[in-house]
Amino acid sequence: MAHKKAGGSSRNGRDSEAKRLGVKVYGSELIPAGSIIVRQRGTKFHAGENVGQGKDHTLFAKVDGYVEFTVKGAQQRKTVNVVPYTGVDGE
C-alpha cells in the first residue's frame, strides 16, 4: 500500500510586498505641482523650499519647477527643494 507519512508544518514561507520606496524624481528634472519626489520611511530626506511632507513622510512638490537636492547644516541633512519654473520668458 502506497502511503505517505504526515509531513511537518513549517512556520516560514511568508514575505511582505515591496513598498516601492525611494526617490521618484531626480535632480534638475522638471515636475508639476503635487508630484511625489521621494517616498520614504522617516525623514531620510527633509522638505526644503516649495516641498511639502505628507503624514507618511512622502515629499511632494508644492509648485511647478525643477528638483534640487542639497546637503545642509552640521548634521549634513539631505534637503529637497523645488526651484519654481517661470516659463520660457523668465529663464
Swiss-Prot record:
Coiled coil: none annotated. Keywords: Ribonucleoprotein, Ribosomal protein. InterPro entries: Ribosomal_bL27 (IPR001684), Ribosomal_bL27_CS (IPR018261). One of its GO terms (biological process) is translation. One of its GO terms (molecular function) is structural constituent of ribosome. The keyword Ribosomal protein applies. It comes from the Bacteria. Pfam families: Ribosomal_L27. One of its GO terms (cellular component) is cytosolic large ribosomal subunit. SUPFAM superfamilies: Ribosomal L27 protein-like (SSF110324). Belongs to the bacterial ribosomal protein bL27 family. PANTHER family: LARGE RIBOSOMAL SUBUNIT PROTEIN BL27M, RIBOSOMAL PROTEIN L27. This is Large ribosomal subunit protein bL27. It comes from Chromobacterium violaceum (strain ATCC 12472 / DSM 30191 / JCM 1249 / CCUG 213 / NBRC 12614 / NCIMB 9131 / NCTC 9757 / MK). The gene is rpmA.
